[in-house]
Regions:
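GNAT-family acyltransferases
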Residues: 1-114, 130, 134
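Conserved acetyl-CoA-binding loop-helix of GNAT-fold acetyltransferases
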Residues: 116-130
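Extended, charged alpha-helical interaction scaffolds
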Residues: 135-139
Length: 139
């Protein structure tokens, strides 16, 4: 969704940034994990397919995807590289385009060291707030 292409959401534990082509190699690496494939009901994709998926998510009017970054790592770096801070992703799927207040949020904390630390909870809360604010702004 182009709506979030220039958006950064800063929480206490996580930073949400738009999913761009620079994130694809790390994301693809995560999705080679059989555990993550099982937990997310995903099929393994080639790197080229992963790039195509990222492009389609960016263009779809009913999807909004952010990469979840570890805020502590991101803020500690003099020049933060997002790839080194990646923890997972969060998605908003609009389930009824006639009523954009209806949707589904999915969160994946792919980095094992980031699990159990509240990253998923904060990412979901930031996404709910962003979705509500974006809806209000578009009316």
């Amino acid at each position: 969704m182009r709506l979030n292409q220039n958006t950064l959401l800063l929480g206490k534990k996580v930073v949400l940034v738009p999913y761009t082509s620079e994130h694809v190699p790390r994301y693809h690496e995560w999705m080679q994990s059989e555990e993550l494939q099982r937990l997310t009901a995903s099929e393994p994709l080639t790197l080229e397919q992963e790039y195509a998926m990222q492009r389609s998510w960016r263009e779809d009017a009913d999807k909004c995807t952010f990469i979840v970054l570890d805020a502590e790592k991101w803020q500690a770096q003099p020049v933060p590289t997002e790839e080194s801070c990646m923890a997972g992703d969060v998605n908003l799927f609009l389930t009824n385009l006639e009523d954009p207040t209806l949707g589904e949020i999915e969160v994946m904390i792919a980095e094992p060291s980031c699990r159990g630390r509240g990253f998923g909870t904060e990412a979901a809360l930031l996404m709910m707030s962003y979705g509500g604010d974006a809806q209000t702004d578009s009316e």
